[in-house]
Amino acid sequence: MKSTPAFAIVSLAFAAALVHAQIVVKNQGFVPFADAPIRYRSENLADPVAKLQKQFDRGAIALEYEPGRGYLPSVLRTLGIAVNSQTLVFSKTSFQYPKISPEKPRALYFNDDVYVGQVRDGMALEFVSFDPMQGAIFYILDDRHVEHPRFERAELDCLQCHVAATTTKGVPGVLLRSVVTTPSGAQAGGTPSYVTGHDSPFHERWGGWYVTGTSGKQTHMGRAVGTLDTSPFLAATSDIVAHLVLAHQTQMHNLITQTNYQTRLALYAEDARNKALNLPAGTISETGRQRFERPAEALVRYLLFADETPLQDRVEGGSGFAREFAAKGPRDAQGRSLRDFDLRKRIFKYPCSYLIYSEAFDAIPGPAKDYIYRRLFEVLSGREQGPEFASLSGGDRKAILEILAATKAGLPEEWKQSIQAVNRKP
């Protein structure tokens, strides 16, 4: 069968087996997370879906079932996920792949902490929900009408696809992968694949996706909605701005989790070393420090969009996603927010990821977070003038520093003292 010149997504994908037939994950170069100190299978979780299930268990809230829509509208409302975050993909990358095609794409929705997938006429909704300490947690929800709907954790099945050294930074995570597809939406054999982030070439993105909105002279591999019947979906759009945000956010989430895991593993090993050598508690060797400073440095670069692929023309979505996303703030006294879009030369007006406000970022262990804050301050204050951050102008750095000082809780005192000193100068 002839392949279409398109790229498809492998995003939030689940392997064919369900939670009742889990498979042991083979070691493919990823971070050890099953045992101490990570203990990924722990039931002590604080991700949004886990919190929601606890509310169900207490009888505090209930999901509403809508004929033809299932639990999806109620789930999105309860989790605070906007309908206009919808993106439509027709690659066969869900465990429900037989039901996915260009005529019946899968719908994906997201906010800062949760990703939701629905397949038309499918048997389950698919979730990736981010726990502050454990990162991506995978769930399914039976989408048939039952008296007591319940989120079921589906971990090792999902991890067959969702843990890889080169695509999810070696931790349980999320990814957008572009692959050449056949006309049915299946991946064509022997074809390349690309992981999509904000640093991906524009022309390699979004094949296998439906994309609505405009990108000017910039070309991409996405497909216009055209004759697709969008009436079964919650929205008629697959907004290009939502696609841009999704590409950034997925890899940012993975870097946060990687830094968290590597720091915990390093501190765990250092604690054992200190006890064996009778060293003072809290001593960190140079080797141990390098173990978490390497991913932390990568996080800083990505957080500040250091390698972002520049936009060559204006991008417009048209669904209202950009407006609603930006309205979430927070804003400083001048009305500036890290959620403000540029969409002419780059994604955001102030290039520092809004995920710096997330619980997952705040949960990064102290030594790594101290390093991140130190490096951020060096870059934003202008002390760091290396080529790695050349994309940030002096005005960008000053604005981001001021926005964070005004809106981000828990910053080192050095930040505020420095800004106050600058403001006192005549």
Task: Kindly give the residue locations of the regions a language model identified.
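N-terminal alpha-helical interaction blocks
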Residues: V24-G122, S129
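Short glycine-rich, low-complexity/disordered patches
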Residues: N84-K92, S193, P310-G317
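Positively charged n-region of N-terminal signal peptides that target proteins for export
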Residues: M1-A6
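Boundary at the C-terminal end of the N-terminal hydrophobic targeting segment
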Residues: V19-A21
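Bacterial N-terminal signal peptides
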Residues: A8-A17
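Sequence context surrounding c-type heme c attachment/ligation sites in exported
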Residues: I23, G117-Q290, A296-L304, I347-K425
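A short, ordered amphipathic alpha-helix with a cationic face
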Residues: A62, L343-F348
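Mature extracytoplasmic or organellar-lumen-exposed domains after removal of signal/transit peptides
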Residues: D271, L277-I284, L304, E308-K345, ...
